[in-house]
Amino acid sequence: MTKNLLEQLREMTVVVADTGDIQAIEKFTPRDATTNPSLITAAAKMPEYQEIVDQTLLQAKKDAGAGASKGQIVSLAFDRLAVSFGLKILQIIPGRVSTEVDARLSYDTEATITKARELIAQYKAAGIGPERVLIKIASTWEGIKAAEILEKEGIHCNLTLLFGLHQAIACAEAGITLISPFVGRILDWYKKETGRDSYPSAEDPGVISVTTIYNYYKKFGYTTEVMGASFRNIGEITELAGSDLLTISPGLLGELQATIGELPRKLDPAKAATLDIEKISIDKATFDKMHAADRMAYDKLDEGIKGFTKALEELETLLAERLARLEVVASH
């Protein structure tokens, strides 16, 4: 009997759940899980997770001490909420959870390093070692440099919002643990740019981008793992079968599970080793030049940081409203 696509994918690629929804993670039993500001905000709005939100707020209020302003309490709770979700997720997965640094720090190396250390300290205080956490940082030059320093301290990083080969090479040269090249968002850009409704999966610009990055890494023996992310359909996923990891939303995990058929391996280190690829080295000037020349990567990195910032601001508003409600309840 032919296995479903998800079972076959798991034989060649580590399957990761891209969600903050703990029930969805329990359903699909991935090895790892990834969260981002948008996913944490979405989960924080779900009725089944109000208890996590409330507990985090009440603990933050207690720790902030008497006389702390609402803003200070919300700020403290905000930092802790992603870790609260991460801790719950780590109870049900055997591997690692990715927790994102505040996207508003994406162009500030020092602030990113400080925030990453704080997140790791919170996990450590809850009994979780750094080997089970990936700190997610946007793939700006400043973010990559922050991650390079963090990796030397034993803090493992997942460089996200990655759209171009220049970003990927800079990450590999910096010794980053893992990158998340985005597939669907690249497709979105090209569809808008060309006016096309769709692309065959093998010609999908996002698929081509991740394939190029994977082949480059394997050709030159980089240890940085490639985790394709941001999928719009299962065709994009099946075209990247064989990638080190793929992080997939619950909806698409369900679709893969419900689909029976053969799944051939598309990405293969042995095949990559035979390719004729030019090796390039990336310093800041080269990075800036290549980034400016790659309009898609330039647009999508900027848009991604703005999108995550908007989600963070929405979460802060949500926490402030929730705190006010808890205080009203406490005063009665």
Swiss-Prot record:
Protein's GO biological process: carbohydrate metabolic process; pentose-phosphate shunt
GO molecular function, one term: transaldolase activity
Subcellular location: Cytoplasm
EC number: 2.2.1.2
Keywords linked to the UniProt accession: Cytoplasm, Pentose shunt, Schiff base, Transferase
Principal location listed in the UniProt entry: cytoplasm
An annotated GO cellular component: cytoplasm
Pathway this chain belongs to: Carbohydrate degradation; pentose phosphate pathway; D-glyceraldehyde 3-phosphate and beta-D-fructose 6-phosphate from D-ribose 5-phosphate and D-xylulose 5-phosphate (non-oxidative stage): step 2/3
Superkingdom of this protein's organism: Bacteria
Catalytically driven reaction(s): D-sedoheptulose 7-phosphate + D-glyceraldehyde 3-phosphate = D-erythrose 4-phosphate + beta-D-fructose 6-phosphate
CDD domains in UniProt: Transaldolase_TalAB
Transmembrane segments: none
Keyword DNA repair: no
Record-annotated active site: K136
SUPFAM superfamilies per the UniProt record, alphabetical: Aldolase
Similarity remark: Belongs to the transaldolase family. Type 1 subfamily.
Function: Transaldolase is important for the balance of metabolites in the pentose-phosphate pathway.
Protein name stated in the entry: Transaldolase
